[in-house]
Amino acid sequence: MKITILEDSSTQEVEITIHCKKTDSQILRMIASLRSFDRTITGTKDGQTFLLLPNDILYIESVDKKTFIYTLSDIYESPPRLYEFEERLAGDGFFRASKSSVVNLAGVRSLRPDFGGRLILTLNSGEKMTVSRQFAGTVKQKLGLGGNTL
């Protein structure tokens, strides 16, 4: 692989061009990795600001008008409101689980039905979350589970 960087002070936006014989899985992974830098999210913890990638986030929760980001190892606070995260991360596999939470589908280990049409998610951290009946259908649809599968 050959990498060339051209610096141009008149450039307004970073542009990356890939020259290859054929677009294969390795190229697609590189593109996905590059795009993830554009979707970096900031969170604060102990007075420090951290850069978080969507793949590292298990879920985002709103508590007392504050927004918290949960990863496998830490909890961060972030200024955007929950609906802003939902809109921004929808293409990254995030979905609304309740009025107060947005979950990363990649962070879900398993799910099972619960009373009243709700779902219980087990996250990769072992933590359990409830998907309200209002949003359970959307989750099933994202997973390709139609009808009475669950």
Residue map of PLM features:
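Short, structured patches in soluble enzyme cores that scaffold and shape functional sites
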Residues: 20-22, 125, 133
